Amino acid sequence: MNEVLFGSKNAERVLIYIYSRREGYAREIARFYDTDLKSIQNQLDKMEAGGVLVRREVGRTRPYTFNPRYSLLEELKGLLEKAFSFYPMNLRQELVMNRPGPNAKDSSS
């Protein structure tokens, strides 16, 4: 939808995913969009090198989040908010639905 602004479809996917879920890691993002893991990892690496994203170590995963020190963060989030509003409702709902982690307990038992 906005690949022209973001540079590529996968760059847009990475940014929208992290915008809507607050964080994400390469395999999770690639799986969500059913796309190539290497392409997503390349985008994450570029955005980390450019200071847009930061990565932290959590066990064996390395989730990425927006870099709070990125000088255009508020403007970027405003643009992403607007872009997100044009996504189909079903995709927006899937993006904001947070799945429990692998060690989460089922509270219904």
Positions of predicted regions on the chain:
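Short, cationic-aromatic polyanion-contact patches
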Residues: 2-11, 25, 58-80
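Pre-recognition alpha-helix immediately N-terminal to the DNA-recognition helix
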Residues: 12-16
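Short helix-capping/hinge SLiMs at alpha-helix to coil transitions
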Residues: 18-21
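Short acidic, hydrophobic short linear motifs in intrinsically disordered regions
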Residues: 23-32
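Key DNA-contact positions within bacterial/archaeal DNA-binding proteins
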Residues: 38
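Short, hydrophobic-biased segments on the C-terminal half of alpha helices
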Residues: 44-45
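A short, conserved structural fragment
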Residues: 48-58
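Amphipathic alpha-helical dimerization/coiled-coil segments
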Residues: 71-109
